[in-house]
Amino acid sequence: MIPDLSVNFAGIKLKNPVLTASGTFGYGYELADLIPLKRLGGVVTKTVTLEPRAGNLQPRIAEVASGILNSIGLQNIGVRAFIEEPLEKLNKIGVPVIVSVAGVAVGEYVEIVKILSSQNGVSAIELNLSCPNLKKKIVCHDLPLMRDVIRGVKKVSRVPVIAKLSPLVTDISELALTAQNAGADGVTLTNTYPAMAVDIRTFKPKLSTVKGGMSGACIKPMSVRCVYDAYQDIKIPIIGCGGIMMGEDAVEFILAGATAVSVGSSSLVSPGNLIAIIDGIEDILKEKNIKSVKKIIGGINKVRNA
């Protein structure tokens, strides 16, 4: 028996639940010579902004125990250049394309999505709500602002809108519920965790910005908990993200309530891990004689309530 790995995420049909995570896979098409991109459930692009950004100064990435610390600074070519080349190349892959976008104000988010909505080949928008606004405050930490961003984008978007949320909150369920009530069609849980590291040889921070975002295996239990908590309270689907290194990790997120998963650090270390994760999910379903991955979404709740 070959299990059915297909899922429906907010109306988007995915052949399997494994997506790339924004920020570690370029725009998506660059690795076509390394792995069969057609096998992926979908591609989430690196974050696109209204105007090009050079990003932060080097060093902006550092390896730490069981993870990666980064502060890239949203380096990208800007939305207009993105639709000229990367989007066109992505559309040739044949998988859903989810475009990650970020801005410093409501109007900027709306303008980016307006431009993207005029193009074919965009399956969904992922709002990076963990970046600073004009007041240097994380967007999703300002609930009224987050509501305004989501509502504004929903008015102009022709495709589903997914809110990617920061884990640095007291109650992730409240944050996810706020996103849902503002009109989000799904949420991604979670973005990186704030962290820093110091080089004891130079007595300097390992990143030029001092602090950055932690990703990798070390954050998985915390991100799984975020997915589980949010799943109890929201009705919109969840993309689980954070520390997925193998098929077993992906299944953990799905059992906790994720409909799909996005893989970041693991694909940065070895792009082929994406394919191994897809195969790993299939192997676990075969072993358990489960016909469809859809049957295990939120499965831990069914076991607890049995």
Curated annotation (Swiss-Prot):
**What does the entry list under GO cellular component?**
cytoplasm
Query: Which positions bind FMN?
Result: S22, K46, T47, N128, K164, G216, G242, G243, G264, S265
**Cofactor note (record):** Binds 1 FMN per subunit.
| Pathway this chain belongs to | Pyrimidine metabolism; UMP biosynthesis via de novo pathway; orotate from (S)-dihydroorotate (NAD(+) route): step 1/1
- Tell me the Gene3D superfamilies matching this sequence: Aldolase class I
Its EC top class is oxidoreductase
Q: Does the keyword RNA-binding apply?
A: no
Which CDD domains does the entry mention? DHOD_1B_like
Q: Which reaction does it catalyse?
A: (S)-dihydroorotate + NAD(+) = orotate + NADH + H(+)
User: Which cofactors are reported in the record for this sequence?
Assistant: FMN
Q: InterPro entries, from UniProt? A: Aldolase_TIM, DHO_dehydrogenase, DHOD_1B, Dihydroorotate_DH_1, Dihydroorotate_DH_1_2, Dihydroorotate_DH_cat, Dihydroorotate_DH_CS, Dihydroorotate_DH_I
The family assignment reads: Belongs to the dihydroorotate dehydrogenase family. Type 1 subfamily.
How does this polypeptide assemble, per the annotation? Heterotetramer of 2 PyrK and 2 PyrD type B subunits.
* Function of the protein: Catalyzes the conversion of dihydroorotate to orotate with NAD(+) as electron acceptor.
Protein name per UniProt: Dihydroorotate dehydrogenase B (NAD(+)), catalytic subunit
| Organism name | Endomicrobium trichonymphae
